[in-house]
Amino acid sequence: MAKAKSSRSKSTSRSKAVRSKTGGAKTKRAGGIHRELKERLILAGKVLVAEGQDDFTRGHISFRLPDDPNLFFMKPHSIGLDEITMENILTIDLEGNVVAGKARRHSEVYIHSEILKARPDVNCVIHTHPTYATALSSTGRGLKCYSQPGALFYDALGTYTDTINLIRTQEMGAGVARALGDGRGVLLKNHGVVVIGASIEETVIGIIMLENGAMVQLLVEAAGEAAPEFPREDIEKLKHDISRAEQFVVNFDYLVRRVKRRG
């Protein structure tokens, strides 16, 4: 009997040791993934500023944690998009509560939390105040496909008109999520834009393309006689061609290299 107990005790100890090692390995892997994501967020912030998406310390970017879909990393308040660091990135839950990090969170955190809550397919959310897209949001007109960048948001761009003020409550954030629907972005009337994606690369390139599409549209309309949009079948084919994941990565990596060359 004593030998049986001893055998069970040794077996239990071995099981605990295996679980401990397995848990430690998982934690280590998660830590490595988290670090890579934070590094990508830092690069994304620098690219956004280089592409004219900055507005002092306003604007924010978030990314859902792959190992816990109820948490996301987010840029903190009071710094520019190009000042994101490993140390100041916040970890936030889907109710907008900071669960890790000492910096102050953005009051518009609910744009991110409510979209991530409503859209399990979305991992990255960016909100900025780009000049042309914000101007377009103020006209009450949607984005037309006068250029290739505009095709990316064809039938995929909502409009939020409930307020022109900051999105500071869960209810307002939920309103933005409803305006987004199953689309790729939202024009916030007289305010700015929100763009989403499955990856950081897709979302950064998407918000840059939205601004380019809005710029072309406003220039065309300012010329006095708007050209007709592309035929629907052409737009849908073009949208498919420019929506491939590898294209987003290639273009994002190019912009990162350009930022690094410029110092």
Task: Identify the residue ranges that each predicted region occupies.
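Glycine-rich flexible loops
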Residues: 2-10, 14-263
